[in-house]
Amino acid sequence: MLKTCFPERLKQLRRDAGMLQADLAEHFKVSKSAVSGWEVGRNQPCYDILIDMSILFGVSVDYLIGRRNY
């Protein structure tokens, strides 16, 4: 499920927040290519980063991974 919903949701949340991939990479101390990989479904962030993403964007981890639509 993470591979199908997460990339699109992450990209939309990042754009809605007015952030570039480079901004997200800096925030999470990862490479820009890691963020790009998350957004195309090539790879997945660790659970700790998922939790931090949910806090940053004000959504639940369940929303990020597609278990909930809100």
Where are these predicted regions, by residue range?
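Short alpha-helical DNA-recognition segment
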Residues: 18-37
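Residue-level signal for the short linker/turn that defines the boundary of a DNA-recognition helix
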Residues: 8, 18-19, 45-48
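DNA major-groove recognition helix of helix-turn-helix/homeodomain DNA-binding modules
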Residues: 48-63
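Residue-level detection of the helix-turn-helix DNA-binding "recognition helix"
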Residues: 15, 29, 40-42, 51, ...
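Short, charged recognition helix plus adjacent turn
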Residues: 1-4, 55, 65-70
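A short, Lys/Arg-rich alpha-helix, primarily the initiator
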Residues: 1-16
